């Protein structure tokens, strides 16, 4: 899980999800692409 000020999709499989006001990126193909804004 990377914590970044600006989250961007790294690959085509990355999805932007908003949970409890926190923007997250989840990726099925590569779990290393997981990110959280903060």
From Swiss-Prot:
GO molecular function: structural constituent of ribosome
Any Pfam family matching the protein: Ribosomal_L36
UniProt KW keywords: Ribonucleoprotein, Ribosomal protein
Transmembrane segments: none
Coiled coil location: none
A GO cellular-component term linked to this record: ribonucleoprotein complex
Keyword Ribonucleoprotein applies: yes
GO terms of biological process kind: translation
Cytoplasm is among the record's keywords: no
NCBIfam families (alphabetical): rpmJ_bact
Protein family membership: Belongs to the bacterial ribosomal protein bL36 family.
Annotated protein name in UniProt: Large ribosomal subunit protein bL36
Organism of derivation: Myxococcus xanthus (strain DK1622)
Source species taxonomy: Bacteria, Pseudomonadati, Myxococcota, Myxococcia, Myxococcales
């Amino acid at each position: 899980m990377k914590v970044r000020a600006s989250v961007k999709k790294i690959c085509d499989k990355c999805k932007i999800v908003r949970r409890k006001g926190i923007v997250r990126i989840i990726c099925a193909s590569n779990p290393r692409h997981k990110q959280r804004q903060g």
